[in-house]
């Protein structure tokens, strides 16, 4: 059985070990590639300050590239008796290279090592989320343009209110994603700062070159203060979780709208048949299960910031084992959100729109405001026009003109989709993912 990195002469209690390790071995598989990348940057820096020879660095880099390839192919495993990904990588290096493998931990603690792994993992996941959001955004904008002239009822208080359009409906969710991406960009900028070299949270007596590892890993800058670098554990995850939650909130609302509008009582849209399921007893049913699950999963993601906040709440400065539990709720959340984005993008691309909703007389009253405004344009005071139309409705004399003339920015006749698309492009361009990608390719020699 592999020896623990911290093991001394005290016998390990197996029940205590099971309790303290928890799900770390499972969760750390998310971090394997990133742990290897961090080690490659760290040992390159160690060689530059004389703690490794050039030949030792060459051996270690070759071995780490092999381990990275295993992780990339999903073949990396954390063996029984090994606590975490850091221990497994060091064990593999030591088996292959002997004492040289034992040198990689100089000037480093598992505290800053896991901080680094989490940041490398998170920024890579943010890139994938951003790309998925952008794909959904483009589908929504295309559908908004396609159906810009198709009117639908607008609602307030779940009561029919005023004319809207499918152009507005699709476009509203597109613009919501722009704001969501601003949160994601802010989270990325906080995440893209290098904690490596903070060690256990108080630095090291080795002359570490933290600027060098920052450059090698493609970070924007450092977490300069070593105490704050450690204090940032939990805070970084919470801030990223807020960004994920804002995206999830948009998807949840869209899923609810689609389920509602797909129901027979509304009949505004038709979801793709392959995204519905049947009933075991009612042969006519086509249930919108994909969007119902999307709504539930997204609501779960919206609880993530509170979960993380409560786990890390009231901790003083320094490292505490409480923080380990955050990984269990944080790491899987990215895949869940990506799944929801993928499903929503597919459905929004395939959704069918009822182009004749307003032929139904039940929606005639949504044009009452249009009539009030027409009278006001002809010179009648607005309040008098409002009263006249109200009395006509009560007396059953109201006959609507089912035409709308909305021309101001963001209205039915002037969706401003080009401006919304420009806003999204501006946000996307502000991420600057190319820095981290170039750095990682350089480390791997690709």
Outline where the language-model segments fall.
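Generic, well-ordered alpha-helical scaffold segments in large soluble proteins
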Residues: 42, 63-70, 92, 96, ...
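Alpha-helix capping and helix-loop boundary segments enriched in small/acidic/polar residues
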Residues: 105, 110-113, 157-164, 168, ...
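A general structural motif at alpha-helix termini
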Residues: 60-64, 217, 273-275, 389-396
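Short amphipathic alpha-helical segments with heptad-repeat character
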Residues: 119, 123-130, 134, 141, ...
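Conserved helix-loop functional segments at active or binding sites
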Residues: 146, 183-186, 190, 219-226, ...
